[in-house]
C-alpha cells in the first residue's frame, strides 16, 4: 500500500491549522500569516482533497463588502485552479471580544442576534462554495462561575439558535447539515455540550434533528478522559457522525492539537480501524496546530505527517483484520455472539425460558473458557508496531 495521499483519501485541513501563527496565551506569534491561496496550493500539492474555513480565516473581521468579495474571488480561483473542494465551513464566534460571554448563549440578547446573522451570512458562502457540512463549536458558550449563567435558559437559547439555522437552510433549499463540535474545559471553564454524549442528547430536542449530527475531535474527548473510538462508535450507532476532526493528544491536559498519530497512538489505531471498517464516507479532517517551534517547512511536514500516519494506520488495521490468527482470536472472544440479539424470541419467551434464570447454572457459566482479550490485544499491538508480516 502506498502512503502517498491522493484526493481519493478525502483528507482535508482547516485554514486555521497550517495557518496557525504559533500565538498562545504565553507567547506571541512565531510565524507570519499564511495567505489562504498559498494554503490551498500547497495542500493540493501534498495530495489533500479539500480545505475548510471559519469566516474570519478567509475574510478578516471588519472587511468591507468590496474587500470581502475580493478575498472570496481569490480563494475561489485557487480552488478552481487546483481542484480542491470545500466540504465544510464554520463561524468564528469566539475570537472578537464581543463574544466574551458567548455567541448563541450570551446573556446580551443583541450579541445573540448578531451571532446568528454572522453565522447565516457565512452559511450562504459555504453553500455557494459547495460545502455539505456546517460545523458549530461553541467555545465561548459557558461560564466560569455558578451564578453567571442559568444553564437551562442557555440551552433554550442554544436550541433556539439551531432551530432558526435549520429553518434557514431548509427555506433556502441548501444541501447542508450541521455538525456540533463538543469540547470540555477551555476556553471557558465550563462549556456547554462538552462531550459527544451531551451533544447527542441535545440534538434529540431540536425541531429538525435529522439536520444535526456531531463533529467529534480526538483531543476534545480525551481532554475529558474519555475513549475517543468509543465516542465515535456511539455517534456512528446513532447515525450522527457528520464530520470528524483528527489530531493527537497526550492524556488529560490542555488541547494540544498535535498532528494525527502523535500522542495516543493506540487510540489512533483503533479509531482508523473503526472508521474504515464502518464504511465512514466523510472527509478525514485534520484539526491540528504545527508546533510554534516550526518554520513553514515544518508546517507542511507536519501536515504531510497527518496524512501519512492515517494511511499507515489504515494499512495496519486492514492487515490486523485480515490476519487468520486475529480472526480465530475474535471468534474465541465470542464477538460474534455479541452481534446476536439477546432475546430475538421476544419478552414472553424470555420470561418463560427457565434456562435463562431458574435453571441457569451460574457456576458452569463462570467456569467457561476465559476470554482471550489479552491475546487479541497483543495481536493488535504486533500489527500496530509492525511485528507481523
Swiss-Prot record:
Keywords attached to this entry: Carbohydrate metabolism, Cytoplasm, Isomerase, Magnesium, Metal-binding, Xylose metabolism
Oligomer and partners: Homotetramer.
Location(s), subcellular: Cytoplasm
GO cellular component: cytoplasm
Stated role: Involved in D-xylose catabolism.
Reactions catalysed, as given in the entry: alpha-D-xylose = alpha-D-xylulofuranose
CC cofactor: Mg(2+)
Free-text remark on how the cofactor is bound: Binds 2 magnesium ions per subunit.
Active site: 54, 57
Family: Belongs to the xylose isomerase family.
Cross-referenced InterPro entries: Xyl_isomerase-like_sf (IPR036237), Xyl_isomerase-like_TIM-brl (IPR013022), XylA_actinobac (IPR013453), Xylose_isomerase (IPR001998)
PANTHER family attached to this UniProt entry: PTHR48408, XYLOSE ISOMERASE
Name listed for the protein in its UniProt record: Xylose isomerase
UniProt binding sites for Mg(2+) 2: 217, 220, 255, 257
Molecular functions per Gene Ontology: magnesium ion binding; xylose isomerase activity
Keyword Cytoplasm: yes
NCBIfam families (UniProt xref): xylA_Arthro
Signal sequence segment: none
Gene: xylA
Main location as per UniProt: cytoplasm
E.C. number: 5.3.1.5
Amino acid at each position: 500500500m502506498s502512503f502517498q495521499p491522493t484526493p481519493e483519501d478525502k483528507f482535508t485541513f482547516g485554514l486555521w491549522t497550517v495557518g496557525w501563527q504559533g500565538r498562545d496565551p504565553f507567547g506571541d506569534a512565531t510565524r507570519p500569516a499564511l495567505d489562504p491561496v498559498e494554503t490551498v496550493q500547497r495542500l493540493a500539492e501534498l495530495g489533500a482533497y479539500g480545505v475548510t474555513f471559519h469566516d474570519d480565516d478567509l475574510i478578516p473581521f471588519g472587511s468591507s463588502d468590496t474587500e470581502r468579495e475580493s478575498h472570496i474571488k481569490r480563494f475561489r480561483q485557487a480552488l478552481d485552479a487546483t481542484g480542491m473542494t470545500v466540504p465544510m465551513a464554520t463561524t468564528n464566534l469566539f475570537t472578537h471580544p464581543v463574544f466574551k460571554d458567548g455567541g448563541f448563549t450570551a446573556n446580551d440578547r443583541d450579541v445573540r442576534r448578531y451571532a446568528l446573522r454572522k453565522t447565516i451570512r457565512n452559511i450562504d458562502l459555504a453553500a455557494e462554495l459547495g460545502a455539505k457540512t456546517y460545523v458549530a463549536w461553541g467555545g465561548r458558550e459557558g461560564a466560569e462561575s455558578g451564578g453567571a449563567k442559568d444553564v437551562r435558559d442557555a440551552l433554550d437559547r442554544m436550541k433556539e439558535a439551531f432551530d432558526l439555522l435549520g429553518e434557514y437552510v431548509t427555506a433556502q433549499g441548501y444541501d447542508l447539515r450541521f455538525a456540533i463540535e463538543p469540547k470540555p474545559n477551555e476556553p471557558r471553564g465550563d462549556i456547554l455540550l462538552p462531550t459527544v454524549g451531551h451533544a447527542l442528547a441535545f440534538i434529540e430536542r431540536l425541531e429538525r434533528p435529522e439536520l444535526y449530527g456531531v463533529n467529534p475531535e480526538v483531543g476534545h474527548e480525551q481532554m475529558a478522559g474519555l475513549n475517543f473510538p468509543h465516542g465515535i462508535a456511539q455517534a456512528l450507532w446513532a447515525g450522527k457522525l457528520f464530520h470528524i476532526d483528527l489530531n493527537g493528544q497526550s492524556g488529560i491536559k490542555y488541547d494540544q492539537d498535535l498532528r494525527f498519530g502523535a500522542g495516543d497512538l493506540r487510540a489512533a489505531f483503533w479509531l482508523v480501524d473503526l472508521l474504515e471498517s464502518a464504511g465512514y464516507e466523510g472527509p478525514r479532517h485534520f484539526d491540528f496546530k504545527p508546533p510554534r517551534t516550526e518554520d513553514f517547512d515544518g508546517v507542511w511536514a507536519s501536515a504531510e505527517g497527518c496524512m501519512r500516519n492515517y494511511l499507515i494506520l489504515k494499512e495496519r488495521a486492514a492487515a490486523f483484520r485480515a490476519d487468520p490468527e486475529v480472526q480465530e482470536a475474535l471468534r474465541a472472544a465470542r464477538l460474534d455472539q455479541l452481534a446476536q440479539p439477546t432475546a430475538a424470541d421476544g419478552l414472553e419467551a424470555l420470561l418463560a425460558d427457565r434456562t435463562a434464570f431458574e435453571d441457569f447454572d451460574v457456576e458452569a457459566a463462570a467456569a467457561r473458557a476465559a476470554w482471550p482479550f489479552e491475546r487479541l490485544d497483543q495481536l493488535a499491538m504486533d500489527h500496530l508496531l509492525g511485528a507481523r508480516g
